[in-house]
Amino acid sequence: MAQTSSYFMLISCLMFLSQSQGQEAQTELPQARISCPEGTNAYRSYCYYFNEDRETWVDADLYCQNMNSGNLVSVLTQAEGAFVASLIKESGTDDFNVWIGLHDPKKNRRWHWSSGSLVSYKSWGIGAPSSVNPGYCVSLTSSTGFQKWKDVPCEDKFSFVCKFKN
């Protein structure tokens, strides 16, 4: 009798295994849809805001800090860069430069994001950063479809993109 019971248990286990074989266990829970304030756009787990007011780099970053504790946008991947570029282009702006959060605070050509994120992805335009005419703050340029970076003087006034968690 015990042998028959073991036989049925073995058959049951084999049937279960054959039914579940080839199915991957769900390891990630679906992400909740992020809700961003009106006038901003969501990408992954952040909200983005394009402001056409022209400010210096410092004033633009302060504006972003006062707006939901954000910063000028840190572009951490090529995909995020493409999203930011489309956000700027969709605005219909005629600006040639748009501030992002990359800067060289010690003027030693070591770049930092104002958000504190690590600089691992880079998208410098041709000839940038410049050694001939160095700037210590970074903008996206319209000539590259707002996808490439250029170092420019921090005192210049450009529109800008903020990035923040909601």
Swiss-Prot record:
One of its GO terms (biological process) is antimicrobial humoral immune response mediated by antimicrobial peptide. Residues 34-164 form the C-type lectin domain. InterPro entries: C-type_lectin-like, C-type_lectin-like/link_sf, C-type_lectin/snaclec_domain, C-type_lectin_CS, CTDL_fold. Keywords: Disulfide bond, Glycoprotein, Lectin, Pyrrolidone carboxylic acid, Secreted, Signal. GO terms for molecular function: growth factor activity; molecular function inhibitor activity; oligosaccharide binding; peptidoglycan binding; signaling receptor activity. In pancreatic acinar cells and, in lower levels, in brain. Enhanced expression of PSP-related transcripts and intraneuronal accumulation of PSP-like proteins is found in brain from Alzheimer disease and Down syndrome patients. SUPFAM superfamilies: C-type lectin-like. Might act as an inhibitor of spontaneous calcium carbonate precipitation. May be associated with neuronal sprouting in brain, and with brain and pancreas regeneration. This is Lithostathine-1-alpha. It comes from Homo sapiens.
